[in-house]
């Protein structure tokens, strides 16, 4: 069954090593076989994923991922992986997550034309600082030379480009706006289940009582800070709030984002 699949135990056995190497990672991104994990790891099996430039400093490779890689093949393999993971216990709908889908959103929608896309929006100063913090920590697992300021500059520019690309895709004539839902990160933190209810309602999806109860239990069992607090500041990574907000100005205005306290 879904609950006793032997792959669960095999997967869980891989995580203690991460906890030993970078114990602070759990506070940023808890991992477990029964927890959600980002598609960026499955995309890595195609060798087309920002995961590698997160873990290692390989800018020329990431340039190729950004501008030349074949995302049609990425999502063909992505579908095979979902079929492999779910063939014993088929469900009505997958819930998938990763910012890396910005890179190939057009091909994701071609592969899964009935997909419903939730965009999470946040003050880019906070987003870029958090991303730089996570990347700096992950790179420290394999290198003694980690430049957090370079990481922030590099990824801020790349993510801005991919964000603009994904907005161009969704603004095209091929995809109805009802296929997309806008969510502010701060709203989700304040009322996780309330936002989930809005998502289900917006997409016309049934939310069963059993599913709602399980979500509420999970939220109660996993409060913010359960595994420690992830602390970071723009100054540590050379993130200039004024410059970043000016650069992302059209994005912030379009989606009604206000500057967060730093």
Listing of model-derived features with the role each one plays in the protein:
Residues 82, 94-95, 119-121, 244:
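Long, contiguous hydrophobic alpha-helical segments, chiefly transmembrane helices and signal peptides
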Residues 77-81, 104, 165:
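Well-ordered alpha-helical segments embedded in enzymatic catalytic cores
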Residues 71, 98-101, 110-113, 120, ...:
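Active-site-proximal structural scaffolding
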Residues 1-94:
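PAPS-dependent sulfation machinery
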């Amino acid at each position: 069954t879904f609950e006793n699949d032997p792959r669960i135990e095999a997967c869980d056995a891989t995580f203690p090593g991460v906890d030993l190497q970078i114990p602070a990672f759990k506070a940023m991104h808890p991992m477990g076989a029964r927890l959600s994990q980002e598609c960026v790891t499955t995309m890595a099996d195609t060798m087309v994923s920002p995961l590698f430039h997160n873990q290692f400093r390989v800018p020329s490779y990431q340039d190729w991922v950004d501008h030349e890689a074949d995302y049609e093949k990425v999502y063909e393999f992505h579908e095979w992986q979902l079929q492999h993971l779910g063939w014993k216990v088929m469900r009505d709908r997958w819930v998938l997550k990763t910012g890396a889908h910005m890179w190939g959103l057009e091909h994701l929608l071609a592969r899964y034309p009935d997909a419903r896309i939730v965009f999470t929006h946040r003050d880019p100063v906070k987003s870029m600082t958090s991303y730089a913090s996570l990347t700096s920590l992950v790179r420290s697992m394999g290198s003694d030379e980690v430049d957090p300021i370079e990481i922030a500059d590099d990824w801020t520019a790349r993510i801005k480009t991919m964000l603009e690309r994904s907005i161009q895709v969704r603004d095209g004539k091929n995809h109805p706006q009802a296929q997309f839902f806008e969510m502010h990160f701060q709203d989700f933190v304040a009322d996780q289940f309330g936002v989930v209810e809005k998502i289900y309602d917006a997409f016309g999806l049934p939310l069963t009582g059993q599913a709602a109860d399980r979500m509420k239990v999970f939220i109660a069992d996993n409060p913010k800070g359960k595994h420690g607090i992830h602390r970071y500041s723009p100054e540590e990574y050379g993130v200039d709030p004024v410059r970043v907000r000016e650069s992302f100005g059209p994005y912030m205005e379009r989606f009604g984002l206000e500057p967060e306290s730093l």
